């Protein structure tokens, strides 16, 4: 009996340690992300414009995004994985830099960026709290999120051809919902012991928060009359 209690306690401590390390690494990951965004915004660097074609730029972004995720996951238990995560977040900061530069140079732009950031933080805190209490089937939610990810990617590619503003807003709203659920799923998976790598968990949470912030920023800019 004592042995069973010890095993349960040790397992609980282990899961809590992974979650704590995940949150800590997630916080650190925003340092290079902020540096990348500030660098790109101050330098006026536009990644897509640098290639002279949005298609080439889009392909390079996809290669960077999924390539880095692959290498981070391959090193998910080592310090190399942490280093690669920092490189990844810096790169993602560079990508969002031009949007921030644009937003900060329009009327009420700083306020809009602040609102998007505050709403993102609120979503994260809310979904993290819900993850501790939810009774949802995480396997079913995981399957739903997989289907949702495919639908969103198809919609993104389709709108590159169509260029419909209303569809772009719908996609942004979809990313907010999808990423919010992803936060809850990832945190709950760590709590349940289904994820033992704080690097992988932090990566998922960073991408989710990045998507929420950028999507909310797009929505708020559109509501403010800015395309």
From Swiss-Prot:
Keyword Cytoplasm found: no
Subcellular location: Cell membrane
Origin: domain of life: Bacteria
Annotated membrane topology: Multi-pass membrane protein
Positions of transmembrane segments: 25-45, 49-69, 80-100, 111-131, 144-164, 165-185, 201-221
Gene Ontology molecular-function annotations: calcium channel activity
Family annotation (InterPro entries): Bax_inhibitor_1-related
Pfam family for this entry, one: Bax1-I
Predominant localisation class: membrane
GO terms for biological process, alphabetical: regulation of proteolysis
GO cellular component, one term: plasma membrane
Keywords for this protein: Cell membrane, Membrane, Transmembrane, Transmembrane helix
Protein known as: Uncharacterized protein NMB2020
Record organism: Neisseria meningitidis serogroup B (strain ATCC BAA-335 / MC58)
């Amino acid at each position: 009996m004592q042995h069973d209690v010890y095993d349960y306690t040790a397992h609980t401590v282990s899961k809590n340690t992974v979650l704590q390390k995940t949150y800590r690494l997630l916080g650190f990951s925003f340092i290079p992300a902020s540096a990348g965004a500030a660098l790109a915004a101050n330098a006026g660097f536009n990644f897509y414009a640098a290639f002279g074609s949005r298609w080439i730029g889009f392909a390079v972004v996809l290669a960077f995004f999924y390539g880095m995720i692959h290498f981070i996951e391959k090193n998910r238990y080592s310090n190399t994985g942490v280093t690669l995560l920092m490189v990844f977040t810096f790169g993602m900061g560079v990508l969002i830099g031009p949007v921030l530069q644009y937003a900060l140079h329009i009327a009420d732009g700083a306020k809009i960026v602040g609102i998007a950031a505050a709403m993102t933080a609120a979503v994260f805190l809310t979904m993290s709290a819900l993850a501790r209490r939810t009774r949802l089937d995480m396997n079913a939610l995981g399957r739903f999120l997989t289907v949702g990810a495919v639908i969103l990617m198809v919609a993104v590619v389709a709108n590159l051809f169509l260029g419909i503003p209303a569809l772009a807003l719908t996609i942004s709203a979809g990313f907010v919902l999808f990423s919010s659920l992803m936060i809850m799923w990832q945190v709950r998976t760590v709590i349940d012991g289904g994820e033992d790598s704080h690097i992988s968990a932090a990566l998922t949470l960073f991408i989710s928060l990045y998507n929420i912030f950028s999507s909310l920023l797009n929505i708020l800019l559109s509501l403010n009359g800015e395309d």
